[in-house]
UniProtKB/Swiss-Prot annotation:
Pathway: Amino-acid biosynthesis; L-arginine biosynthesis; N(2)-acetyl-L-ornithine from L-glutamate: step 1/4. Belongs to the acetyltransferase family. ArgA subfamily. It comes from the Bacteria. This is Amino-acid acetyltransferase. HAMAP family: N_acetyl_glu_synth (MF_01105). It holds the Pfam family Acetyltransf_1. InterPro entries: AceGlu_kinase-like_sf, Acyl_CoA_acyltransferase, Asp/Glu/Uridylate_kinase, GNAT_dom, NAGS_kin, NH2A_AcTrfase. GO terms for cellular component: cytoplasm. Residues 296-434 form the N-acetyltransferase domain. It catalyses: L-glutamate + acetyl-CoA = N-acetyl-L-glutamate + CoA + H(+).
Length: 443
């Protein structure tokens, strides 16, 4: 019997290896809302968390219990009370909160302990540690309303948490914390996860909600948001009356975490099997990232980028779309190239060849990775090349193209005669290739 080979599996593994190396030894804070815990996909999420641990990632898991607490209150016919969208935790509510949180802690610990069963890592031991790593204090009284046992973080024993992470344990923390006087307080999982990510200097904070991240007006996933954009989303949702959805709660924390030094905060769906792995081990992820600095950068190319440029343009050269360039030619002309990189992969490039005497520049070798051609990378490159041309005193920009005529025309270029090319370029014109000449004023 001949075994079938899966090239998709091979390609996926090759693409994931750089991320495995990057993530190893880093600290991730994972926030699991009560909605995620009660979903049928939760066992898969726990298995994926166990897999992350086996890859050497330091994990702090924070769980919430909102729906479980509400169900407990309803079962005991105890009406929940809120003030300014914050739960008021009276003595009776506190007992039910502790009951729900305690049950979840035992359940999650048990699931994590067996998460690697039925895998090649079966028998590997996962140590899950919980404790009084967080000291709480009361929220107090606001507008005459006593929040009772609703609290906030007073301090975090980050050194003790680091010791547990150094020993290879997963740290598991829930919504109940104690004060210096021995009282118990009900805290939000968002505050706990956010403050832990900040204090532990975590590389990432990861949250789960019902949808696959934040969407735009067309319903498409927004892959990246800066903190000010995420804050605007929160304010818009609050204006619409949404104060406590999983997305809004996470975004509030993500904005604060990013502004306090956490590099990336990820929002993904608890309903999608494997979403955690797809988000962390693929170039584009599957959800929404909140970042201070984009995973994508546009910059001038250096000699170290030649390999990436060649890998990008070779298929287009083989199809006859681009004129062939040797490695030696690229090495000599690398200072003319601008590239767009995403997670150290070159996904687009273009070059500017100036003709100073005629005050004209050529935009050449324009290439965009097939996975990104439906996005605006071409426009981004055009804007950058045009800006570079104006900066050095050029007044016009031209292109020679056989396939992208309409694309350039839609962006202000018009067909012109070959005679309008700079003299040196005119002498090099390939009449067999018969490229169209298009030109635009830079203004």
């Amino acid at each position: 019997m001949v075994k079938e080979r899966s090239t998709e599996l091979v390609q996926g593994f090759r693409h994931s290896v750089p991320y495995i190396n990057t993530h190893r030894g880093k600290t991730f804070v994972i926030m699991l809302g009560g909605e995620a815990i009660e979903h049928e996909n939760f066992s898969s999420i726990v298995n994926d968390i166990g897999l992350l641990h086996s890859l050497g990632i330091r994990l702090v898991v924070v769980y919430g219990a909102r729906p479980q607490i509400d169900a407990n209150l309803a079962a005991h016919q105890h009406e929940p009370l809120y003030h300014k969208n914050i739960r008021v935790t009276d003595a009776k509510t506190l007992e039910l909160v502790k009951q729900a949180a305690g049950t979840l802690q035992l359940d999650i610990t048990a699931r994590l302990s067996m998460s690697l069963n039925n895998t090649p890592l079966q028998g590997a031991h996962i140590n899950v540690v919980s404790g009084n790593f967080i000291i709480a204090q009361p929220l107090g009284v606001d507008d005459g309303v006593d929040y009772c046992h609703s609290g906030r973080i007073r301090r975090i024993d980050e050194e003790a948490i680091h010791r547990q992470l150094d020993s290879g344990a997963i740290v598991l923390l829930g919504p109940v914390a104690v004060s210096v006087t021995g009282e118990s307080f009900n805290l939000t999982s968002e505050e706990i996860a956010t403050q832990l990510a900040i204090k532990l200097k975590a590389e990432k904070m990861i949250g789960f909600c019902s949808s696959q991240g934040v969407t735009n007006d067309d319903g498409d996933i927004v892959s990246e948001l800066f903190p000010n954009e995420a804050q605007a989303r929160v304010e818009a949702q609050e204006t619409a009356g949404d104060y406590n959805s999983g997305t809004v709660r996470f975004l509030r924390g993500a904005v604060k975490a990013c502004r306090s030094g956490v590099r990336r905060c990820h929002l993904i769906s608890y309903q999608e099997d494997g979403a955690l792995l797809q988000e962390l081990f693929s170039r584009d992820g599957i959800g929404t990232q909140i970042v201070m600095e984009s995973a994508e950068q546009i910059r001038r190319a250096t000699i170290n980028d030649i390999g990436g440029i060649l890998e990008l343009i070779r298929p287009l050269e083989q199809q006859g779309i681009l004129v062939r360039r040797s490695r030696e030619q690229l090495e000599m002309e690398i200072d003319k190239f601008t590239i767009i990189q995403r997670d150290n992969t070159t996904i687009a490039c273009a070059a500017l060849y100036p003709f100073p005497e005629e005050k004209i520049g050529e935009m050449a070798c324009v290439a965009v990775h097939p996975d990104y051609r439906s996005s605006a990378r071409g426009e981004v490159l055009l804007e950058r090349i045009a800006a570079q041309a104006k900066q050095i005193g050029l007044s016009k920009l031209f292109v020679l193209t056989t396939r992208s005529i309409h694309w350039f025309q839609e962006r202000g270029f018009t067909p012109v005669d070959i005679d309008l090319l700079p003299e040196s370029k005119k002498l090099m014109y390939n009449y067999q290739r018969r490229s169209k000449v298009l030109m635009a004023d830079l203004g």
